[in-house]
Amino acid sequence: MRREGGFIGSQPPWDGANRPGNWSVLDVYNRQRQSLWIRSSDPFVNNVVCDLRFEGLNNGTVFVDSGPLLLPVSRVGTSGVITSTTRSKYESASGLFPDSNGYLSVTHPNLALGAGNFTIEMWLFVATSRSNNGILSLGTSDSIFTVILSAVSNFLRVAGSSNIASVPLNSWFHLAYVREGTGTNQAKLYLNGTLINQATNASNYNQTFYSIGVYFSSGFCWGANMDNFRVTKAVRYLTNFNPETDTYMS
């Protein structure tokens, strides 16, 4: 840091798409004042491209991305996602999604996963069986959604695999979809830290929009609770893990 207060180091690479140049003292002050300064022991914090923690008042309609990109979060649909204090995995609230016509959307050039490695994860709470309900799709509208995670006939699905495992009911569960390469069986789904499916996924995901809580159509939304949705452009888990201690979410 220059003693005269001009610059603080070089700007982290994940913020390059937002602001060129170095960080000033005012940049740091404003982040701290807005509680946006990231203090984390997470070794992958600079690889995070989306981090929704769903904190807010009951029936709240404001959603904040806590990741380095500070993405604007949009509510899409006529029903609308809300924050609910009725149940939460961490802190005081979670996101409550309607069964239809209500999901969240974020967009940024850095959201494109390409053919690289990634970890998509979240905590979910489901009170009743899921029929055709979306967890994450890429794209901006019904006609171009690419479904990544969903629940169909109460079975979990990921891109390229179906009917993997039943959706747990009436308890929080952690779901992590990890692509550690594009070779055979390098795309893995973990339920509560235990590997339940592995397949091949060599898709090039160039979409810069995430539609969270929706299936192939806005008529099929998540319809349940979600907490701590996070996407990381890195492999967080190579083997079974403990989601209570190994995720850096709590």
Q: Where on the chain are the PLM-derived regions?
A:
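Extended recognition patches within non-cytosolic domains
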Residues: G5, Q11-C50, L57-L69, T184-K188, ...
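A general structural signal for stabilizing positions within well-ordered secondary structure
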Residues: D42-P43, S166, F220-G223
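Extracellular glycan-recognition modules
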Residues: N46-V49, N58-S66, S100-F155, G181-Q186, ...
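Bulky hydrophobic/aromatic "packing anchor" residues in well-ordered structure
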Residues: D65, G95, L136, S211-I212
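Extracellular glycan-interaction surfaces
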Residues: P68-N101, I120-R130, D142-S203
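Flexible glycan-contacting loops in extracellular carbohydrate-active proteins
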Residues: I196-N225
